[in-house]
Amino acid sequence: MASYFPPGAASSHVSTRSSSPASSPLSPPAQQRSNALSNRLTSVLSASYADSDIRDALETLSLRGIHNTAEVRRQLRLDVQKEVVDSNAEIVRDFGKVAEQLKRIGTVISSLNQTCEEMKKHIVLAKQDTTPVLEEAASLMNQKREAETKQQLLDAFTKHFIVSEEDLLILTSAEEPIDERFFDLLSRVKQVHRDCEVLLGGENQRLGLELMEKSSRNLNSAYQKLYKWIQKEFRSLNLEDPRISSSIRRALRVLAERPSLFHSCLDFFAEARDYVLSDAFHYALTDAVTGAGGDNVKPIEFSAHDPLRYIGDMLAWVHSTTVSEREALESLFVADGEELAKGIQAGLNSEPWSRLDEDETVSFDGQKALSDLVNRDLTGVSRSLRQRVELVIQGHDDPVTCYKVANLLSFYRGTFSKLLGPRSNLADLLETLEKFTLRHFETLMRNQVNTLSADHAALIPSDDLSAPEFLQDALDVLTALMKTHEASFGADVSTDDGDNDSVNRFAPVLRAALDPFLELAKSTADELPNPTARAIYLTNIHLTTRSTIAAYPFASATHLTPLSTALSSLRVDLLAIQHRYLLDASGLQVLLAALEPFSPSSTNGPSDTANDGQQQKQPQPDIADIANLPAFQPDALVATSQQLDDFLPSALMDATDNLKRVQNASFAKSVTEEAVEAFCRDFEFVEGMIIGADEARAKVDVTRDRAVEDDSASDSDKDKDEDGDEDEDAEKGLGLRRLFPRTTGEIRVLLS
């Protein structure tokens, strides 16, 4: 056993005791003692007091309170050894107690081991006896868990797929109301029907088929109940009431999932609304309106004597009713966004057999369906409107009123096209009525033309050669038509909406209301034998017509150019007439006819290329020979000059008076001015030819005079008894210019 004191301390005490000579009888010799002492001293001296063991020993001594005396030093070893022995004895006693306790523990452990062995034997026996019971209990527990799982599955299946009898009664019984519970149950049954498809994916499809068949029957019964309930509600539905029941809107959204029932319901609704609106239209036409309108509001039939107002009132009522009907149907069918469209689309997808083409993708257009429903609601109103409009138009013979009605119908056709679509029944009806009205308008125009053609008195031109009265009346009607068209469509050239090509929609009116009358008026000019009167008469007709349509671009676009072309041709004719009048009245025509061979057109030869090879080139006439022409003989030329002098003072007034019956003064003035200018050019030509002839004769006379001077002596004896020949030679010596002294400048001044 280890010591309670450090080993160094004990050894130090032993060494101290051994230093005494009498410490032991077995002490070694002195030499050995001396060596041992020396070694001891050396050891003591070499010991380091910084050693931890020495420090601990010193600390222990310090704690024991030992004083450094000789007695203490002598007894220290013994005391320490005694303490060591006592400590060891105490330890031995303690270990003895521990040994006894260990023996008792060993006995207990042996007893426990024996008991455990016995228990093991009992456990083995018990295990052998309980193993079948435990196995059976485990099997029963597994069966219990399986039964509980099946029970949970059955409860969940029953809760999800089986509808109770009470719920089925709410869903299918006609006595039960259509409320929130009905729609919730219907949604649940639809979900069950959809989930049955999962059951059909298993090996045993019997349960899925039975449940699907049962849910289908329940759904059909529910939809039939909903269909009948909606029909019942439609009978008492008031679309004018802004508070339309939300339940009927929801019912319509749900019923939309069955397109066949939904369309049948819409058919019933359309028939009911058609009856209601037809009755309301008849009431507005014939019965006095009471209530808010008061006595000032009268039936539409009161204005039947005025076709435009009568038809306008009917169209206004139809338009107002259409707008109200569309707004009411929008609140009924489209108030909740696209829910109805989604339901109908789902129904179309669920009924693929309803498609005409298997590959066709059916899509639902809500706005188009709404417009179609409004059209169907107004079927009776449209039929009554058509009958009344046609009767009014057929019984009226004023073309202006007919055209105003046609424009009114065109306006409402555009309005209904925007409201219900371009292919809606109302738009087609108004287009048909518009065409009917225009055909009646054209018929009235043809009848007027036929009547005028048979009235010979009306076809005789007036004395002042103005446009015939029937044409002026037709132009007055045309003016009213153009004003109506301008008020309806504007002054620009309008086109039909349905055509991409630019088509003037007023052109048919012009062809019916202007062209026949204009052609008839032009044909009456054949009654005038005088070409001048005939030209003036035709000019007045075209001028009057052009002035009427010139202010309207849509009329000028098609007819102004032909009228201007005809006027240009007539202007040329009048110019030729005026020119010929000036030439004949002044006598200048005789001189021009005589000078025809000397004109540039004659000297250049014929212009007809077909005769170029057949005619020989004529020799250039001698200008000096003009004096030998009959028209330029002194007497004739003096007479022509005198006639010209008599004509010039009043020439312009006479020429202007010649066209005084042309009803456009500026037109007549311009024609006269051009005719005067042409006359001046002709006179200038004659003047030039006369001067040229005199100059040519002067050259010939100089040559002849020289020859005469050489023969003067021999000629002096000739007979001079013929006085007439001498006078004639004297007059020829004066020259043509002196016989015809007028100049072009004087002519222009006198005719300006």
Curated annotation (Swiss-Prot):
> What topology does it adopt in the membrane?
Peripheral membrane protein
**What superkingdom heads the lineage?**
Eukaryota
Q: Which GO terms describe its biological process?
A: intra-Golgi vesicle-mediated transport; protein transport
User: Which is an annotated Pfam family here?
Assistant: COG6_N
Its GO CC terms are: Golgi membrane; Golgi transport complex
Bias-annotated ranges (Polar residues): 601-619
The entry's localization annotation reads: Golgi apparatus membrane
What keywords are annotated for this sequence in UniProt? Golgi apparatus, Membrane, Protein transport, Transport
- What SMART domains would the database entry show? COG6
InterPro entries hit by this protein: COG6 (IPR010490), COG6_C (IPR048369), COG6_N (IPR048368)
Ranges annotated as biased composition (Low complexity): 9-25
Question: Region annotation Disordered: residue ranges?
Answer: 1-36, 601-620, 702-736
Listed Basic and acidic residues bias regions: 702-721
Q: What does this protein do?
A: Acts as a component of the peripheral membrane COG complex that is involved in intra-Golgi protein trafficking. COG is located at the cis-Golgi, and regulates tethering of retrograde intra-Golgi vesicles and possibly a number of other membrane trafficking events.
Which family does this protein fall into?
Belongs to the COG6 family.
Q: What is this protein called?
A: Conserved oligomeric Golgi complex subunit 6
Q: Which organism is it from?
A: Aspergillus terreus (strain NIH 2624 / FGSC A1156)
* Protein's gene: cog6
